[in-house]
């Protein structure tokens, strides 16, 4: 059946939503206003050539040059305090396991988000396998210390806990995965999303920037060598637009950016 009109399905890099009135549901997601929700709307988004973990904040964030920049910096600083109070808690049962598996041999002065994410991916890829037959680990603890059979939900959940245990604010996100190939092959036609396209990932808070998506599910991210090569390349940001029709459970996209994926998100 079609997607729920109570939710606004948009890429994580959304810039503008037009065609419907929206509201913020606390700091977790946007939602359409009105009892009937949204049927058709247009989303404009900014796709970067870099994956999120390579994002670097603008220099003016530390030293604002205009009143607008100053207002942004002040508001972000207030919200950042809220983020660190509410998105760094770790499950007590998992805490010692996370420390042993992910950070026992890490540097004491703390890792950058980039290196921490790479560490999480490395540990998960070495200790677990994707459960293609549907036989999953019971929970994150079982994934890390027991059967080691995961899917996107378990990988994202483990990553959130692991990053939080390193002092990095993170949260769990569910949505749909639209690959660049899907977007290109559809051209101006509809892309139909079903349960087969359901996905989960983590969002990590970058100081001065905000929440950005980070995927740790094997097969859904660039390897460490490719990431290092990307650092030397100039970034290019592309603006694309997509139309969502929740009643038909479809999405139309013009271009797919250059990131290789365009997740449509609901944050929980």
Model segments located where?
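Hydrophobic, helix-length membrane anchors
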Residues: 43, 58, 259-268
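Beta-strand-rich, non-transmembrane domain signature
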Residues: 1-23
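Acidic low-complexity segments
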Residues: 15-147, 166
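A mature extracytoplasmic/lumenal domain signature
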Residues: 12, 45-47, 60, 174-176, ...
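Ser/Thr/Gly/Pro-rich low-complexity, disordered linker/stalk segments of secreted
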Residues: 230-232, 237-263
